[in-house]
C-alpha cells in the first residue's frame, strides 16, 4: 500500500521524463486528476486521458519535450507537503516559483489550483508541489 499517492504520481512523471518516455500511465484519484488538468493548462504536458477500465481508473499522460533540444519541459517536479509534515500557506504566503516561471500547486477549500489562482481568489491551503 502506498502511503503518499501524490508523491508516487510525481515520481512516476519524474521517472518517465528521465527515461524520455512519451506516455506514462498512473492510477487515478480526484486530486491527481485535478493536478493533471493544471499541468495541461499550464503547458507542462501535451495531453491526458482518464480511463475507467479498472475499479480505480487510470490517467494516461502524454509528456511534453522541447522540439529542438529534446529536453523535458518539466525540469523539476517536487513534493512539498508530505503526510508526515504538512505545509500550509495563507494567500499572501504562497511563494512565486522561479520568479514566476514555475507554478505551485495548492489544495484549497475551493479545490486544487495554482498558487497564482489561489492568490487571486485570496485563499490559502496546503502546498502540494512545485513544478518548473
Curated annotation (Swiss-Prot):
PROSITE patterns: RIBOSOMAL_S8 (PS00053)
CC per GO annotation: ribonucleoprotein complex; ribosome
Keywords annotated in UniProt: Ribonucleoprotein, Ribosomal protein, RNA-binding, rRNA-binding
InterPro entries, alphabetized: Ribosomal_uS8, Ribosomal_uS8_CS, Ribosomal_uS8_sf
UniProt record similarity statement: Belongs to the universal ribosomal protein uS8 family.
Summary of the function given for this chain in its UniProt record: One of the primary rRNA binding proteins, it binds directly to 16S rRNA central domain where it helps coordinate assembly of the platform of the 30S subunit.
Protein name: Small ribosomal subunit protein uS8
Organism: Christiangramia forsetii (strain DSM 17595 / CGMCC 1.15422 / KT0803)
Taxonomic placement: Bacteria, Pseudomonadati, Bacteroidota, Flavobacteriia, Flavobacteriales
Gene: rpsH
Amino acid at each position: 500500500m502506498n502511503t503518499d499517492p501524490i508523491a508516487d504520481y510525481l515520481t512516476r512523471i519524474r521517472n518517465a521524463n528521465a527515461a524520455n518516455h512519451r506516455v506514462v500511465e498512473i492510477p487515478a484519484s480526484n486530486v491527481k486528476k485535478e493536478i493533471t488538468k493544471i499541468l495541461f493548462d499550464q503547458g507542462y504536458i501535451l495531453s491526458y486521458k482518464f480511463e475507467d477500465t479498472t475499479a480505480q481508473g487510470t490517467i494516461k499522460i502524454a509528456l511534453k519535450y522541447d522540439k529542438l533540444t529534446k529536453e523535458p519541459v518539466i525540469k523539476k517536479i517536487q513534493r512539498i507537503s508530505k503526510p508526515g509534515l504538512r505545509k500550509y500557506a495563507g494567500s499572501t504566503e504562497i511563494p512565486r516559483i522561479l520568479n514566476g516561471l514555475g507554478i505551485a500547486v495548492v489544495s484549497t477549500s475551493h479545490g486544487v489550483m495554482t498558487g497564482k489562482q489561489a492568490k487571486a481568489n485570496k485563499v490559502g491551503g496546503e502546498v502540494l508541489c512545485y513544478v518548473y
